[in-house]
Curated annotation (Swiss-Prot):
The GGDEF and EAL domains are required for the alginate stimulating activity. It comes from Pseudomonas aeruginosa (strain ATCC 15692 / DSM 22644 / CIP 104116 / JCM 14847 / LMG 12228 / 1C / PRS 101 / PAO1). Binds 2 Mg(2+) ions per subunit. The keyword Metal-binding applies. PANTHER family: BIOFILM ARCHITECTURE MAINTENANCE PROTEIN MBAA, DIGUANYLATE CYCLASE DGCP. It catalyses: 2 GTP = 3',3'-c-di-GMP + 2 diphosphate; 3',3'-c-di-GMP + H2O = 5'-phosphoguanylyl(3'->5')guanosine + H(+). It is found in: Cell inner membrane. This is Bifunctional diguanylate cyclase/cyclic di-GMP phosphodiesterase MucR. Mg(2+) 1 binds at residues 469, 528, 560, 590. Residues 235-685 are cytoplasmic. GO terms for molecular function: cyclic-guanylate-specific phosphodiesterase activity; diguanylate cyclase activity; metal ion binding. InterPro entries: Biofilm_reg_signaling, EAL_dom, EAL_sf, GGDEF_dom, MHYT_dom, Nucleotide_cyclase, Rev_trsase/Diguanyl_cyclase.
Length: 685
């Protein structure tokens, strides 16, 4: 037999080529797995060529390392056939590992086919020598080489399948796996070479007319380095592009989540908004139908929030809403839905097997929300009115439940606020009436349906008249003359009272100017300020503008503020009243005796008169307690140098008693009913 030898440098180079080819194959397997459609096919074809060229190159580098004492060459046709076998086996391997699953039966069949393909590539490449006589193969070494090829292929397929998805340490893991696979491929090659025996006298039929060793060396090295380098460079560039795409996708996903959050949640409190609440309500209805469940809708409105907002500004109002939302969250279960509809309206969707479940929660919320808030160094107090609608008794649809819960909430407000109320069918009619009345009220200002009537104020006991109180009336086209008690509460609920109050102030100043021009220089006019109007940030400017607009001296205008309104936030009230007083406007504390005034604050208030509440006047002749209270109020007013006005005087006995106590002026039906301006002038002519 001819004695063969190996170039150790080329043997080492063949191992390096095998490892690089293995790493390229593993990387390509990952690319094919991540890609889809035509992109996946492109990676599969490119990966098959890169891996096939790598294995083929390793084989022929190993052949270059092999030498015999005779000239050697390689048949071009068989050499190309061996290359095709290597590429085909690689394509099959990549396709196999990119499947969703790789059961052991498929793995075994794939290992057998791929191992056979690699072995066929090897022995076809050996056949390209065209040895005469033919190469003699040792059966044991031949079988061992094929077995190694099959086992190595199985290991390569399993490793590639396991590493097809990326991880943080994927480069190191693939490098280790490529080392194992490269050693296995090289082991198969050199085991196959060990099986080959060349008889003495043999010669290479391809020498001189095939590819000689020199050209083969150049061809193999150039092709090997070019293909593997191109494959790895493309893979690295794609990996970077993929990383950037992944970052972009992550950013887009985060932005999408934020957009969904903004679309479905209130930006201030982070609670679900109306859109998400509607969806939750629909789901609750479907689940209730399916599972025969019951649930409740609680419609909550904050009492006094607008006054806080106007008095302290929107920033503090926003902080208050956030705190209210936190208090609600702390008192409900995780599975319950809390939504903010806007402004100071909240809706709760809760599971309620019995009405008592909803009542218990409503009572707890009313108590919790009415507790004081410490916000930006201010102590703020509000309350909550809650309406409750139960499914299915109070509504079968989302719209019905919301409408009925809202109607129950307004009923709770009508009952005194700071409480809750279950929906009753009778509320619907009232709700419709209130809605229509509100619609008409919004148009009343535009259509000049609001008018002022004037009630005389006279010096005790019988006059003369020293002024009037302006009282609002609504001349409704269908319902006739409507008194303030019927529509002002609705105006306060909706905030329309501020706009109405500004109109009253302007109209009163206009009328007072006409009376002054008519020679009644000793008259003044009193205008009531609602709680919302008093707390409104533009009140002082509104008063100043009305006076300037009608060229009215401030001393002819008296602003009446109820005791409870003035004392709601005494420090803030003091600032407002001092600004009005500095302007020259008279200040009257209305309904005095019904609130909770501190004598210290009362002394500091720049008021010019106290107005005794009519509730104390009604029972003067029969109730000694009321008489004692009125006597005390008169004495207090004298001590503070305030004028005392008694309203609601309807009998001569009341007139005489109040005069005897020392009231400065009187007002009531006995002395004159509220009347239009023309009628008032006629009565004093």
């Amino acid at each position: 037999m001819l004695i063969s030898s190996y170039n150790q440098v080329l043997v080492a180079f063949s191992l390096i080529v095998a490892i690089l080819a293995s790493y390229t194959a593993l990387d390509m397997a990952g690319r094919v797995t991540l890609a889809k459609g035509r992109e996946a096919l492109s990676w599969l074809i490119g990966g098959a060529f890169a891996m096939g060229f790598g294995i083929w190159s390793m084989h022929f580098v190993g052949m270059l390392a092999f030498s015999l004492p005779i000239p050697l060459g390689y048949d071009l046709g068989l050499t190309l056939l061996s290359l095709l076998l290597a590429v085909g086996s690689s394509a099959f391997a990549l396709w196999l590992v990119c499947q969703a699953e790789l059961p052991w039966q498929r793995l075994a069949l794939g290992a057998l086919l791929m191992g056979s393909g690699i072995a066929a590539m090897h022995y076809t490449g050996m056949a390209a020598l065209l040895m005469m006589p033919g190469i003699v193969y040792d059966p044991l070494w031949l079988g061992l080489s094929i077995l190694i090829a099959v086992i190595a292929s199985g290991a390569a397929l399993w490793i590639a399948f396991r590493l097809r998805h990326g991880s943080r340490r994927i480069v190191l893991v693939r490098a280790g796996a490529a080392l194992v696979m490269g050693c296995a491929i090289v082991g198969m090659h050199y085991t196959g070479m060990a099986a080959a025996q060349f008889p003495l006298g043999s010669f290479c039929g391809a020498a001189g007319r095939g590819i000689d060793n020199g050209w083969l060396a150049v061809l193999v090295i150039v092709i090997t380095l070019a293909v593997i380098a191109i494959a790895l460079i493309v893979s690295v560039l794609d990996s970077r592009l993929e990383a950037r795409t992944s970052v972009l996708a992550t950013s887009l996903a985060r932005a999408n989540r934020e957009l969904i959050q903004l679309a479905l949640h209130d930006n201030l409190t982070k609670l679900p908004n109306r859109m998400l609440l509607d969806d939750r309500l629909e789901q609750a209805i479907q689940q209730a139908i399916r599972d025969d469940r019951r649930f409740a809708v609680l419609f909550m409105d904050l009492d006094g929030f607008k006054a806080v907002n106007d008095a302290y500004g929107h920033h503090l109002g926003d902080l208050l809403l956030i705190e209210v939302a936190e208090r609600i969250r702390a008192n409900v279960r995780a599975q319950d839905t809390i939504a903010r509809l806007g402004g100071d309206e909240f809706v709760l969707l809760i599971e309620a097997r019995e009405p008592a479940d909803a009542a218990t929660l409503a009572e707890k919320l009313v108590k919790r929300i009415s507790q004081p808030y410490q916000i930006s160094r201010h102590e703020v107090r509000i309350s909550a009115s809650i309406g409750i609608a139960l499914y299915p008794g109070d509504g079968q649809t989302r719209h019905e439940l919301m409408i009925n819960a809202d109607a129950a909430m307004y009923h709770a407000k009508d009952q005194g606020r700071n409480g809750y109320c279950f929906f009753e069918s009778s509320m619907n009619a009232n709700a419709q009436e209130q809605l229509q009345l509100l619609h008409d009220l919004r148009q009343a200002l535009e259509r000049r349906q609001l008018v002022l009537h004037y009630q005389p104020k006279v010096l005790a006991p019988n006059g003369p008249m020293i002024g009037v109180e302006a009282l609002l009336r609504w001349e409704h086209p269908q319902h006739g003359l409507i008194t303030p008690g019927q529509f002002l509460p609705l105006a306060e609920k909706t905030g329309l009272i501020v706009q109405i109050g500004e109109w009253v102030l302007d109209e009163a100043c206009r009328q007072m100017r006409l009376w002054l021009d008519g020679g009644h220089a000793d008259w003044n006019i009193a205008v009531n300020l609602s709680a919302l109007q008093f707390a409104h940030a533009g009140l002082v400017d509104s008063v100043r503008n009305a006076l300037l607009r009608h060229s009215l001296e401030p001393s002819h205008l008296i602003l009446e503020v109820t005791e409870s309104t003035a004392m709601r936030d005494a420090d803030a009230s003091l600032v407002i009243l001092e600004q009005l007083s500095a302007m020259g406007v008279g200040i009257s504390i209305d309904d005095f005796g019904t609130g909770y005034s501190s004598l210290l604050y009362l002394k500091r208030l720049p008021a010019s008169e106290l107005k005794i509440d009519r509730g104390f006047i009604n029972e003067l002749a029969h109730d000694s307690d009321d008489a004692a209270i009125v006597s005390a109020i008169v004495a207090l007013g004298r001590t503070l140098n305030l004028k005392i006005v008694a309203e609601g005087v309807e009998t001569e006995a009341q007139q005489e008693f109040l005069t005897r106590l020392g009231c400065n002026s009187l007002q009531g039906f006995l002395l004159g009913r509220p009347m239009p301006a023309e009628q008032l002038l006629a009565s004093v002519a």
